[in-house]
Amino acid sequence: MTHTKSEELFRRAVEKIPGGVNSPVRAFRSVGGQPVFIARGQGSHLFDVDGNEYIDYVGSWGPLILGHRHPEILAALERALEIGTSFGAPTEQEIDLADAIIDAVPSVEMVRLVNSGTEATMSAIRVARGFTGRDLVVKFEGCYHGHVDSLLVKAGSGMATLGIADTQGVPKAFADTTIPLPYNSLDALEEAFRAHGDRIAAVIVEPVVGNMGCVPPLPGYLEGMRAITERYGALLIFDEVMTGFRVAFGGAQQLYGIKPDLTTLGKVIGGGLPVGAYGGRKDIMSKVAPAGPIYQAGTLSGNPLAVAAGLAMLRHLKRNPQVYTRLEECGARLAAAAPKGVTVNRVGSMFTFFFTDGPVTDWESAKRCDTSRFGEFFRGMLDRGVYLAPSQFEAAFVGAAHSDEDIAKTIEAAKTA
């Protein structure tokens, strides 16, 4: 497998774009080599500029649960393009998408559309502070909530991949409003609330972590978190940008039966286009401008193309609940075929092969992974036509377009990678 044209494009890119990429993990820094440049996608497969074909387990980092170029998504986009690309004014389709989200996600009574997961979490934090009149926020080590200044403390995703504990450019005063705690430890959460309970506005959490690899909650963890926040009058925010409509139609909150106060969404709800949303209890969301005093706005919020693609996606998933059964089956088959000496974490169609012998339940245990071994495995799989996330600390995704043949080829590739 050759990558001559990708290498040529990367040489051009590094002269014009920081690091040659528009999001750090794409640069392959942690796995070695240079990124492949994609020419097109179809179904469960990617095709690079050198003509190489890959079975895709990145799925644009989660949004493409139905695969690339799904006909219903394309048809919705074509209809939307005939009408216009952006209006900066309300449309009926925005209400339809809001209805679809509220219908599916148990805790959401009102919802505001934005343009990214980062915007969604940033806005949810502001709303939580405005609603409670408090300033501190609890987050968890290895969880990533977008590149919001105060949430880039001990964050996951690209910061974990590149080994950056805390980014430059965030004033200490911003970081001091964030309390980072170990994930899956109720004792640590209790201690934080005993010390600062009257100042904590919210706890924000990925209910299933995807940004230090896939790390599910231990039994009772989310239930305990819900009880603690209620006892102290703090809001519980589920960051379901990754898990929303992915681990279940109603997200992780449906899967685990826990209702947060606020929820952030993205990825799947845009059908592959840039989008985000935050929503929750009506008494909280009614404080958002212009209905209330907590300001948030966006020129392209509710963009008709993203709304059209997202609405088509959610309607398809609602009509076809068997999609989730298929995703569970494929995820289980892949997990069962993990290489020796590897710990597999999986929730539905999210999974990670952790190159460590021990269980991975938090950031400290994830950090013990042999990232060099993962890099070798990644490159071996890439050479065999399987495209995984280029980081030990990112989840992989099964999509509805993955065929039995795709799964079988992936399992066979893993035996020799």
Curated annotation (Swiss-Prot):
Cross-referenced InterPro entries, in alphabetical order? 4pyrrol_synth_GluAld_NH2Trfase, Aminotrans_3, Aminotrans_3_PPA_site, PyrdxlP-dep_Trfase, PyrdxlP-dep_Trfase_major, PyrdxlP-dep_Trfase_small
Q: Where in the cell is it found?
A: Cytoplasm
| Biochemical pathway | Porphyrin-containing compound metabolism; protoporphyrin-IX biosynthesis; 5-aminolevulinate from L-glutamyl-tRNA(Glu): step 2/2
Keyword Cell wall biogenesis/degradation among record annotations: no
Q: What is its main location?
A: cytoplasm
Per the record, its GO cellular-component terms are:
cytoplasm
Q: Which PROSITE patterns match?
A: AA_TRANSFER_CLASS_3
- Cofactor(s) in the UniProt record: pyridoxal 5'-phosphate
Enzyme Commission number(s) from the entry: 5.4.3.8
As one GO molecular function, the record gives: glutamate-1-semialdehyde 2,1-aminomutase activity
Name the domain of life: Bacteria
Q: What's a BP term from Gene Ontology annotated to this protein? A: protoporphyrinogen IX biosynthetic process
Q: By its UniProt entry, which Pfam families does this protein fall under?
A: Aminotran_3
**Catalysed reaction equations from the record:** (S)-4-amino-5-oxopentanoate = 5-aminolevulinate
Question: Which Gene3D superfamilies does this UniProt record tie to the protein?
Answer: Aspartate Aminotransferase, domain 1, Type I PLP-dependent aspartate aminotransferase-like (Major domain)
Keyword annotations:
Cytoplasm, Isomerase, Porphyrin biosynthesis, Pyridoxal phosphate
> Modified residue N6-(pyridoxal phosphate)lysine is at which positions?
K267
Which HAMAP family does the record cross-reference, listed alphabetically? HemL_aminotrans_3 (MF_00375)
The UniProt entry's sequence similarity note says:
Belongs to the class-III pyridoxal-phosphate-dependent aminotransferase family. HemL subfamily.
Instruction: Describe the subunit structure.
Output: Homodimer.
The protein here is known as Glutamate-1-semialdehyde 2,1-aminomutase
This chain's source organism reads: Solibacter usitatus (strain Ellin6076)
